[in-house]
Amino acid sequence: MIRVTVAGAAGRMGREVCRAALEDPEVVLAGGVVEPGSPEVGADLGELCGAGRAGVAASEEPPPEAGVLVEFTTPEATVEHLSYGLPAVIGTTGLSEEQRAKVEEAARGVPIVLAPNMSVGVNLLLGVVRRLSEALGPGYDIEIVEAHHRGKRDAPSGTALLMGRAAASGRGRRLEEVAVYGREGVSPRGEGEIGIHALRGGAVVGEHRVIFYGLGEEVEVVHRALSRRTFAEGALRAARFAAAAQPGLYSMQDVLSSSP
């Protein structure tokens, strides 16, 4: 049994995590943090997420026995919440290098799982992308296309960047050396480039495609999230890991490799 507190409890992902926690017999939803002054302060978390009354109220701060903080907020809020000193699962995307450094510093004192995508399927596919990139070699051009709902703020997605890094590492390169974000103008494709493209529209939960273009064939790896529930369940899996881990910064790869 673990205790979790959800930061960003009134948001899309926060509500989904609250609901998943309330439906999981091995998880206690200890609390939910919402923005100071929000109309959701004091709201019942179960009613907020559509699961029925839970007897746990949303608040501006974590409760005394918060357990693991599950964080799906903004980069600014995520950094601010590090001051709680709680074990954490961070699914917030769009962190700057400076903000990530602050997360790394906080992880010296508490276990933190930092994962732009909590989906088990996506994280298993990263290894597939790396192996394909290595095995197919430089004769295959790599393009990554991701699509999300119109409200997503950061582009490209953190998951697209993870896939780009996996593809680049399969060829012994760093993504920063070979990435091209979108295309325009008049010029041929550069040798070894990895193109990354972002689409935004409608209510798309999340789609990622990695395409290896050869001269005589194409190989495509696709992941489609059909609902946010997959991310919520992955976050709770990461929370179980964080509850038992030593201080340090971890990824979903660490979570999956430790799970039976």
UniProtKB/Swiss-Prot annotation:
Catalysed transformations (reactions): (S)-2,3,4,5-tetrahydrodipicolinate + NAD(+) + H2O = (2S,4S)-4-hydroxy-2,3,4,5-tetrahydrodipicolinate + NADH + H(+); (S)-2,3,4,5-tetrahydrodipicolinate + NADP(+) + H2O = (2S,4S)-4-hydroxy-2,3,4,5-tetrahydrodipicolinate + NADPH + H(+)
Residues forming the catalytic site: 148 (proton donor/acceptor), 152 (proton donor)
A cellular component annotation (GO) from this entry: cytoplasm
Protein's GO biological process: diaminopimelate biosynthetic process; lysine biosynthetic process via diaminopimelate
Chief site of localization: cytoplasm
Enzyme class: oxidoreductase
Pfam family, one: DapB_N
Residues that hold (S)-2,3,4,5-tetrahydrodipicolinate according to the record: 149, 158-159
PROSITE patterns for this protein: DAPB
Biochemical pathway: Amino-acid biosynthesis; L-lysine biosynthesis via DAP pathway; (S)-tetrahydrodipicolinate from L-aspartate: step 4/4
Alphabetical UniProt keywords: Amino-acid biosynthesis, Cytoplasm, Diaminopimelate biosynthesis, Lysine biosynthesis, NAD, NADP, Oxidoreductase
GO molecular function per UniProt: 4-hydroxy-tetrahydrodipicolinate reductase; NAD binding; NADP binding; oxidoreductase activity, acting on CH or CH2 groups, NAD or NADP as acceptor
Residues reported in the UniProt entry to bind NAD(+): 8-13, 35, 91-93, 115-118
Record bears the keyword Kinase: no
Disulphide bridges, residue numbers: none
Tagged with keyword Oxidoreductase: yes
EC number annotated for this UniProt entry: 1.17.1.8
Localization (cell): Cytoplasm
Family classification: Belongs to the DapB family.
Protein purpose: Catalyzes the conversion of 4-hydroxy-tetrahydrodipicolinate (HTPA) to tetrahydrodipicolinate.
Record HAMAP family: DapB
Name the record gives this protein: 4-hydroxy-tetrahydrodipicolinate reductase
Organism: Rubrobacter xylanophilus (strain DSM 9941 / JCM 11954 / NBRC 16129 / PRD-1)
Gene: dapB
